[in-house]
Amino acid sequence: MVQTKNFPLETRGEAVSREALVQAALKEITQNYREASLSNVAREYGVSLAYVSECVRAETGRTYKELLQKHRMETAARLLRRSDMNIQQIISLVGYENTSYFYRLFHERYGLSPREYRLVRTGTAPRRPTA
């Protein structure tokens, strides 16, 4: 069955709308952003990864990866403003394993390093552990 924007997709004997798939993908991002995977949504609904990806892009104008990165960066920025967690803890918490990659994405989005962002937004430098 070919899916169009307003017609349901038959899967596992049930009708699933594109909107339901997109909402499930967005829910995966907001509730499981550290380990979010579009594969989870595809598996849950019994559809292909490519199909869910296409639905997300068609409905939001962005790829799943772009939406996930946006949510992770916004969460990291909020934690930098509102917590005294160190930057490495925040990087891990929001789901990045590669620190350099996180720093690059953060700088591209906010024009500052995470440390600079925290300093500018809170007016205080993070506490350093004493030896």
For each of these PLM feature ranges, what is it?
Residues 3-10, 14, 24-37, 55-60, ...:
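Basic, amphipathic alpha-helical hairpins
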Residues 7, 12, 17, 104-131:
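…primarily DNA-binding HTH/wHTH and HhH modules…
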Residues 18-22:
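The cytosolic transmitter module of two-component sensor histidine kinases
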Residues 23-31, 58-97, 119-131:
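Terminal helix-turn-helix DNA-binding modules in bacterial transcription factors
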Residues 35, 39-71, 91-116:
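Basic/polar phosphate-binding segments, predominantly the helix-turn-helix DNA-binding elements
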